[in-house]
Every structure is written in C-alpha cells, then in structure tokens.
C-alpha cells in the first residue's frame, strides 16, 4: 500500500493535461508504440474534435522511480470545462493528490481555481506543475507568482515540463512519488468501494470504475450496492493500463473496474458505495454530492418513428452521465419527446451531438430554460422548468429566478468590456481585485443570462482570454413573464419562453421578425404575433401568394374582372379560416438556436 499513488490532474481546457497523460503512459510503457495515439484517454470522437475531455477516465501505471522502487500510479483524468465540474469532484474523491497543471504562457484560469478549491476542501495534496515551457511566450516565474496570489499555494519550486516535447515529464512523475501521500485504508476491514464512474458496454453490461477505500474484493464474490441494497456477483475485475487488464482481486487503495453483469442502467449509480453482501459495512464513503440539472430543454425527434430509439439512446447515455435527467413530454407543435435537464449549455450541446452521432437521430431542441419558482397567491410554490408549466399571470404572487455567483478572470485590458456585458445581463457587482496582470471580477447574475450565451460573449470581448466559473447561490424575486408566439391566432408551445419584462418587447419583436423570414408564403395571409398573457407586444404578417385570375380575360367588361377578384378574395378568406400553417423545421431550429 505504501507504494500506491492515486492522483488526478486539474487543468483548464487546453492547458495540456491529456497530452501530459499520454506522456505518462509512454514513460511507463502502458501501451506499445503502435497503439499510442494522441489523447489516448479521450475515447469519444467528439472529445477529440473539440479537444476537450468530457468523461473521467482512469489508468493504472507501474513506474520504477529513481530510488529503485516500483510504484503503482493510479491516475484519474478529469474534464476541465465548467459544465463538467461534477465529474471532477467525483474523480477527486478517489484521490489523495492532484496535479495543478497550468499553461506557463497563459497563466491561471477561473475554472482551474474552482476545481483547485474543491481539491483543497477534500484535503488533497495539490502540486503545481507548469506546462508548455517549450513555448517562446512561456513565463514560468510570472505564472508561479500568479498561482501563489490567486490560489494561495506555494509555487516557488514548481516542477516545469513540456508535455508536447517530453521535457521534464520524469521530474513530474518523481514529484508525484515524493509528494502525493500513500492511500490510507485497511486491507482486512469490511469492504468499502466508491463508484467513480460507470458506463454501459454492449457485451459486459454495466462496467463500474471503483476506488477501494477499505477491504478487498475478489473475483466471484458477492457484493451489494448500498443505496439500492441489491446484490451482484463479480464476473471480472481488473485495471486499465489504458486497456482492460484482468486481475483476481482489488485491495484497499487501488482503483480498477468491476463487471458484474448488471443490466439495469441504474443498478450501479455513480458516487454510490459497494460493500460485501455477507459482511456489509454500515456507512458509505463520504464526499459525494448529488448533481442537480441547471438547464432544461425539450428534445424531440424529427420523425415520430424514432421515438422508441430516442428513449433507448437517452437511457444508455444517462448511464454514462449521472447528471442527465429526462422525462417524457408532449408538444403540440413537435409531437412526442423528452424534457431533459443538463448542467449547462456545453453539456446540452454535447448530449445532442452524441445522440445525433452515435444513435443516428435527427433532433430538435426547444429553447433552453432554467428552473424558476412561481409562488401562487394561495401560497403554493411551483418549480417551473418549462414555460408551459407557468400558471396564468393573474394567479401568480411572484416569480423567483435563480441567481448565480460568477467568478470571472480576465487580463486587465478587458475589464471595461466585461463589466459592460455583466451590466447588460442584469448583473450586480460583488467584488473586483487586481492580481498581477489579471483581474478577478465577481458578479451575481441571473442564471438564464449565464446559460444562454454569456460564455460566448465573454470569450469574444476578451479575445478568448476571459474565463468563467459559476455556482447557484440563491433565488430572488424577478419580473419574469411568459412570451407566447401565436401563428394565425394559435399558440405554438415549442416557441414559448420565459423572459424578463423589460426585455419582452424587444425579444418578441426580434422573434416575430425572424419567423417572418423563415415561414414560407402560403396561399393566404399568415399573422405572426408575440404575446404576454392577453397583450400582443409584436406582430408581423407573411403576405399571401396570389394567382393572376385575370390572365384569361382579354379586354372585356370591368364587372367580369371584379367578379373574379371578389371570388378570389372569398376563397382566400375561407382558406384562412380552415388552412393550417406548416412551419418548416428550419424555422424552429433557427429560432431556437438564436
């Protein structure tokens, strides 16, 4: 046990943690040269394309240190994006140490700071590493100072390396061996194993990645899941080197996988504790918190025949993703679908992209919304995650919206423009500190403003240097209203949204104008309106197409022409009463995408 080291890497997107993990695998000969490829641990195509890590992965490597001893390094890769911080907190619960990898050219980013505090809260040994020192623009001394000022850990003797060229990677491994504490735990105690992650394999069923805290688990033994109390038998267990390598047992301090033929997707919930069926422990492993979805959106298949496949795809994805929530929903405009809950916009985009890619589904997503609380006049509180659930304006005493505390780190040249966008988004300034070249700005902002497009706007006004981290802190009363879209007097439920009253007119006008361009002309006039309750705030009309009914009259009497025009007018009127407007899918997509 004293030669085991469990650690994870905390780093911002693009600061080189996946490349560094590739180097670890190479130095320790985890894979042959032929099997090495870039970003070995980012196994999904979408992770490679976007260059981000979404799922936490784990690798067990044997490293022979300079003192001649062989150490077992269990390394858990973690994502760096703000939406996936729950993956990070889970990975950290399984470790004793964390490498804080910072790009020596760019410096500290807000996301890294947030994850670093999570690690410090869980009493992990945080070791600063300065990466990308091969870059001409690298300034290791300045960045070391920044780490000290912003995060507050001593970085004077920080190990420097370049994961790309391989310089200093062995020094990093030596630092891990020297500074990360060995795991505590008793091999002979009752079994306690934390499920860090679980995913569905078509052949094996549910595969769970576990960290054994106490005791030993052997092949063929029966164990039970503490939250459900259901018992299973171990079919296979072992470690990832990154390939699956079978072993006979896993003991306290180790990280590995367990396959027990669990078919039910929720059979082994992530963050749960496993223990022996015949001799169970009383208490589960602490340090795990349930994640609440922050953003909700309706997802619908374009053809209704795909609905059963869609349900199955969501069930499979939700196994790999503890934070994805979904329930069936019916929309008059879009048919059958699901109301899904996500951690943030990136999470939503990725889920949608995975559904479309891995399961060949064509999907439409309704406008994302956050959870509001509507307090009715009779005192009842309704949680509203869908505009259609909002009661009529007359029945509501007040609506409360979720407020997040956003920590933004930007280079000092961009402070003015960042403050401007925060004010536009109805933000309230809490704090502003200058730290070296960076400025740390803290704002309380309505969550709906942050999840819609705040991140993109922040990136564009700061030329990509700004970074953001946010957490929900409270609910507060706000003047929110439901904006409905009516087409020829009929409400289109998929286009309804909850907006702030001050912005309602502007948003309504914008929506109506956009729809006007997208809805094709019909044989009759189409009225597009935006309404709040019974008040119409914006209107636009798609003019009717008309056939030239006078083409066959050569000369002749004017009353003949009048008669034909009157007849056409009557026909259009009748058509308008009974005709229904086909809204093309592109119109929905374009309006919902903004």
UniProtKB/Swiss-Prot annotation:
**Limits of the tr-type G domain:** 2-184
List the membrane topology term(s). Answer: Peripheral membrane protein
Primary site of residence? membrane
Q: Give the residues the record marks as binding GTP.
A: 14-19, 131-134
Task: Identify which top EC class this enzyme belongs to.
Answer: hydrolase
Return the CDD domains for the record. Answer: EF4_II (cd03699), EF4_III (cd16260), LepA (cd01890), lepA_C (cd03709)
Originating species:
Francisella tularensis subsp. novicida (strain U112)
Q: InterPro entries from the xrefs? A: EF-4 (IPR006297), EFG_III/V (IPR035647), EFG_V-like (IPR000640), EFTu-like_2 (IPR004161), G_TR_CS (IPR031157), LepA_C_sf (IPR038363), LepA_CTD (IPR013842), LepA_IV (IPR035654)
- Reported EC number(s) for this entry are 3.6.5.n1
Q: Name one GO molecular function term.
A: ribosome binding
Query: What does this gene product do?
Result: Required for accurate and efficient protein synthesis under certain stress conditions. May act as a fidelity factor of the translation reaction, by catalyzing a one-codon backward translocation of tRNAs on improperly translocated ribosomes. Back-translocation proceeds from a post-translocation (POST) complex to a pre-translocation (PRE) complex, thus giving elongation factor G a second chance to translocate the tRNAs correctly. Binds to ribosomes in a GTP-dependent manner.
Cellular component terms, GO, for this chain's entry? plasma membrane
This protein's name: Elongation factor 4
Its UniProt entry gives the catalysed reaction(s) as: GTP + H2O = GDP + phosphate + H(+)
Q: Where are the transmembrane segments?
A: none
Q: What does the record list as GO biological process?
A: positive regulation of translation
Q: Which UniProt keywords apply?
A: Cell inner membrane, Cell membrane, GTP-binding, Hydrolase, Membrane, Nucleotide-binding, Protein biosynthesis
């Amino acid at each position: 046990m004293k030669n085991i080291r469990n650690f994870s890497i905390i780093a911002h997107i693009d600061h080189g943690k996946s490349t560094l993990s590739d180097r670890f695998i190479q130095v320790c000969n985890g894979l042959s040269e032929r099997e090495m490829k870039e970003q070995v641990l980012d196994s999904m195509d979408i992770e490679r394309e976007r260059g981000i890590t979404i799922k936490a992965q784990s690798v067990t490597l044997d490293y022979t240190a300079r003192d001649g001893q062989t150490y077992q390094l269990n390394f858990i890769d973690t994502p760096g994006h703000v939406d996936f911080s729950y993956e990070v907190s889970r990975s950290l619960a399984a470790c004793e140490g964390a490498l804080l990898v910072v790009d020596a050219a760019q410096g500290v980013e807000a996301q890294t700071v947030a994850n670093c505090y999570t690690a410090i809260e869980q009493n992990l040994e945080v070791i600063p590493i300065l990466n990308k020192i091969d870059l001409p623009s690298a300034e290791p001394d300045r960045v070391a100072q920044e780490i000290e000022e912003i995060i507050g850990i001593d970085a004077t003797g920080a190990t420097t390396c370049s994961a790309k060229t391989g310089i200093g990677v062995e020094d990093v491994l030596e630092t891990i061996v020297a500074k990360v504490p060995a795991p505590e735990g008793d091999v002979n105690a009752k079994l306690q194993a934390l499920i860090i992650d679980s995913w569905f394999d078509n052949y094996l069923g549910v595969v769970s990645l576990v960290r054994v805290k106490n005791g030993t688990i052997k092949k063929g033994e029966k164990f039970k899941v503490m939250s459900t109390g259901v018992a299973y038998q171990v079919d296979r267990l072992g470690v990832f080197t990154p390939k699956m390598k079978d072993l006979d047992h896993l003991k306290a301090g180790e990280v590995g996988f367990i396959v027990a033929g669990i078919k039910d997707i929720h059979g082994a919930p992530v963050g749960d504790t496993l223990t022996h069926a015949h001799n169970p422990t009383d208490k589960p492993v602490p340090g795990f918190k349930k994640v609440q979805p922050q953003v909700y959106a309706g997802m619908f298949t374009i053809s209704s025949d795909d609905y059963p496949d869609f349900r199955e795809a969501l069930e499979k994805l939700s196994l790999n993703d503890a934070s994805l929530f979904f329930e069936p929903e019916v929309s008059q405009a879009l048919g059958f679908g699901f109301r899904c809950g996500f951690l943030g916009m990136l999470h939503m985009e990725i889920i949608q992209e995975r559904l479309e890619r891995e399961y060949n589904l064509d999907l439409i997503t309704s406008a994302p919304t956050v959870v509001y609380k509507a307090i009715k006049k009779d005192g009842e509180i309704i949680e509203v995650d869908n505009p259609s659930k909002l009661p009529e304006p007359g029945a509501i005493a007040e609506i409360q919206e979720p407020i997040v505390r956003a920590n933004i780190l930007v280079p000092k040249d961009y402070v003015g423009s960042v403050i401007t966008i925060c004010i536009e988004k109805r933000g309230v300034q809490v704090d502003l500190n200058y730290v070296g070249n960076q400025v740390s700005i803290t704002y309380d902002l309505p969550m709906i403003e942050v999840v819609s497009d705040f991140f993109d706007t922040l990136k564009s006004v700061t030329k990509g240097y700004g970074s953001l981290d946010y957490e929900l802190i409270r609910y507060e009363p706000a003047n929110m209203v439901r904006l409905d879209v009516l087409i020829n007097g009929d409400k289109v439920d998929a286009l309804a949204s909850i907006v702030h009253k001050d912005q309602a007119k502007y948003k309504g006008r914008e929506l109506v104008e956009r729809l006007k361009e997208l809805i094709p002309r019909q044989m009759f006039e189409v009225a597009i309106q935006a309404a709040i309750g019974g008040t119409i705030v914006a209107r636009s009309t798609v003019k009717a197409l008309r056939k030239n009914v006078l083409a066959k009259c050569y000369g002749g009497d004017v009353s003949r022409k009048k008669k034909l025009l009157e007849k056409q007018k009557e026909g259009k009127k009748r058509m308008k009463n009974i005709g229904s407007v086909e809204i093309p899918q592109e119109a929905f997509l374009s309006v919902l995408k903004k």
